[in-house]
Amino acid sequence: MKIAVDAMGGDYAPDEIVKGIELARDAYPDLEFLLYGQTAKVQPLLQNTTRIELVDAPEVIAMEDEPVRAVRRKKQSSIVLAATAVREGQADAFFSAGNTGAVLAAGLLIIGRIKGIERPGLTTTLPVLQRPDQSSFVMLDVGANADTKPFNVVQYAIMGQYYAQSVMHVDNPRIGLLNNGTEADKGDMAHRAIHDALANMAEINFVGNVESRELLNGAADVVVTDGFTGNATLKAVEGTALSMLKLIKGEIMSGGLGGKIGASMLKPVFRQVRSAMDYSQYGGAVLLGLKAPVVKTHGSTKAETVKNTIGQIQELLASHSADQLGTYFAEHSDEMAALKENLKA
């Protein structure tokens, strides 16, 4: 298995990307890497080139670049060349910590969608804090599509089910629809239509509507939503977690000697909470619905997160989930067409 890597994307690129790839190379002996970046900057950072091939990419798509325009114009950028390697069969998956929009655009325009999938969904893994039998759940779409139709969300449920089964190893994943209440008639017309469609799909273990306050309590294994709501929810969850940790730390520091003594006794608890909320252990966000895995991590990614994300990509490749999705949508093309028409009505 070979992974095409954008070495120039991210706040700490190329240093932390290269370190992370070398950690991943040592951790996963079955993997090889095509590292795309500016040779003059990347070459001096490589300590050991075993199973790592550096490919010169003289152009860089910056975080502030307009995504689609940059992908179309910067043909020699690390993002475009890495995605092209996947399209041409030189690599099996694409990894980047760079410009999110450009990574998504490269995935769509260069690698391409699985036939039958109208819009790929960006999928992320989040922690579950209140269930001993469940450590995490996946949510999609978290930002690939700001304008999403009900039919797209129904397809997200199918894609999320396959991801949970093949990568997270959940036998019969519970699928929930993010909504403003748990009752079946909650939400606008679009959400009610999505709810009814999912409830009538025998192959989906649909548990109904899920409220955002119950996400981290393990209300479902897969939560589906439109890209705008999903992205806002993801940022709210991450921001709230960081704010709470800062609040607790501030109260401890202002509590004098007694507060500091109490904090020292609770250190193991704080460490567990911080670890549970640390996104780096869950890898990156996967653009589900493409012909090959495309995985995007936070721009602030460092070496350990890179390594963990590569492990996630290895699971994706080993599961052949893209092939499974392709087979499903090919075999159910008539049902999908009928469902799309029903949801338009």
Curated annotation (Swiss-Prot):
One GO process term, biological-process aspect: phospholipid biosynthetic process
Any GO molecular function: phosphate:acyl-[acyl carrier protein] acyltransferase activity
Pfam families: FA_synthesis
EC number: 2.3.1.274
Signal peptide: none
GO cellular component terms given for this protein: cytoplasm
Subcellular location: Cytoplasm
Main localization (coarse): cytoplasm
Coiled-coil stretches noted in the UniProt entry, renumbered to this chain: none
Pathway info: Lipid metabolism; phospholipid metabolism
Amino-acid biosynthesis in keyword set: no
Keywords noted in UniProt: Cytoplasm, Lipid biosynthesis, Lipid metabolism, Phospholipid biosynthesis, Phospholipid metabolism, Transferase
Catalytic activity of the protein: a fatty acyl-[ACP] + phosphate = an acyl phosphate + holo-[ACP]
Assembly and interaction partners: Homodimer. Probably interacts with PlsY.
Homology family: Belongs to the PlsX family.
Task performed by this protein: Catalyzes the reversible formation of acyl-phosphate (acyl-PO(4)) from acyl-[acyl-carrier-protein] (acyl-ACP). This enzyme utilizes acyl-ACP as fatty acyl donor, but not acyl-CoA.
Protein name: Phosphate acyltransferase
Organism for this UniProt entry: Levilactobacillus brevis (strain ATCC 367 / BCRC 12310 / CIP 105137 / JCM 1170 / LMG 11437 / NCIMB 947 / NCTC 947)
